[in-house]
Amino acid sequence: MALNPTHLLWLDMEMTGLSPESDRIIELAIVVTDADLNTVAEGPVLVVHQPDAVMDAMDSWNRGTHGKSGLIDRVKASQLSESDAEAQMLEFVKQHVSPRTSPMCGNSICQDRRFMARHMPELEAFFHYRNLDVSTLKELAKRWRPGLCDAFKKSNKHEALADIYESIDELRYYREHFIRAE
């Protein structure tokens, strides 16, 4: 497969909390789209094993959210280490884009990037230093076009693959209703 410099790598991760210093990655997924946001390839959805001590340290929001989705049980059953997950994702993305060509795409993607820089640095280094953060458009729309955000309803599943597709759909929405091509 030929590498395409215009393809975008969309990422989402679920973590045990918000601090890269004390919390860990427990799920990640990547989707490749073309520049028009059409899906080109869907990467693996990887659930990373974490020790009981890490899982037991989660706050009530994370325990409730990841318990309800079944992710806690999948993490406990997983045999996949962070380094093996990183290697699998690198193998996948290298089939679609050259290193440092695609921005990291997603919602509140800076948070994912912080975790990746700490726990999966080779994968983080594969992305361009720029981010395509859909939440930036959401924040601008809230301020400049109040009410526009209300029409796009998110399911807030907090499952990596579902969240990626929701982010892509949200960017399509903003492209149609907020960013006017002339």
From Swiss-Prot:
Record-annotated active site: Y129
Any one Gene Ontology cellular component term annotated for this protein: cytoplasm
Domain Exonuclease: 8-171
Keyword presence, Coiled coil: no
Localization terms from the record: Cytoplasm
Top EC group: hydrolase
Major site of localization recorded for this protein: cytoplasm
BP-aspect Gene Ontology terms: DNA metabolic process
Gene3D superfamilies: Ribonuclease H-like superfamily/Ribonuclease H (3.30.420.10)
EC number: 3.1.15.-
SMART domains per record: EXOIII (SM00479)
Alphabetic keyword roster: Cytoplasm, Exonuclease, Hydrolase, Nuclease
Gene Ontology terms for molecular function: 3'-5'-RNA exonuclease activity; nucleic acid binding
Protein's job: 3'-to-5' exoribonuclease specific for small oligoribonucleotides.
Entry similarity comment: Belongs to the oligoribonuclease family.
UniProt name for this protein: Oligoribonuclease
Species for this entry: Thiobacillus denitrificans (strain ATCC 25259 / T1)
Encoding gene per record: orn
